[in-house]
């Protein structure tokens, strides 16, 4: 859904896959001018990846009604300069630049997810554009050092004025996010 000429991405099912990536194993955005709707990812294994599941909205497209369930995620950092800092799940919405406003993220569900990673789950909305209606149910996050790269960092790139921020690693770190539920 990178260019509007291709239209929206709707009604997608990903199931029973083993995914390995030195970037993000599952990525929604960043170049998404069309909307992403009704996405289901289940019964997958993500291993040896820099990021597990990444929803990054920068170019006007929105994400709504996405469900991730029964997934094992193992992440680690590969280099200090690459996008991402070993997050198993990252969700962010930030403007690409002064002219390109980011879309909205809402209705995201994570169920029965096991994470073994160098960093925690990271949610970052922007001023006036908060992430909304996110559920984490039976999500386990184990933090372990696996690489030589610095810890305690979260990566907001790409985006207008966005950078890597030094924030102590936590199982879950959220800001500018409303109606977020952690259950079990």
Where are these regions (language model features)?
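Extracellular/periplasmic carbohydrate-active domains that bind, remodel
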Residues: 1-184
């Amino acid at each position: 859904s990178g260019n509007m000429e291709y239209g929206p991405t709707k009604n997608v099912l990903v199931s029973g896959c083993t995914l390995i990536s030195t970037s993000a194993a599952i990525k929604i955005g960043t170049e998404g001018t069309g909307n992403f709707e009704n996405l289901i990812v289940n019964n997958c294994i993500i291993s040896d990846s820099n990021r597990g599941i990444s929803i990054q909205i920068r170019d006007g497209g929105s994400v709504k009604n996405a469900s991730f369930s029964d997934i094992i995620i193992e992440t680690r950092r590969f280099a200090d300069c690459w996008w991402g800092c070993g997050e198993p799940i990252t969700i962010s919405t930030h403007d690409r630049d002064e002219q390109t406003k980011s879309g909205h993220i809402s209705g995201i569900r994570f169920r029965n997810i096991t994470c073994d990673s160098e960093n925690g789950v990271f949610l970052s909305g922007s001023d006036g554009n908060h992430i909304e209606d996110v559920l984490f149910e039976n999500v386990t996050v184990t933090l372990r050092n696996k690489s030589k790269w610095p810890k305690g960092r979260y990566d907001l790139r790409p985006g207008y004025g966005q950078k890597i921020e030094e924030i102590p690693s936590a199982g879950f770190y959220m800001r500018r996010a409303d109606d977020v539920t952690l259950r079990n």
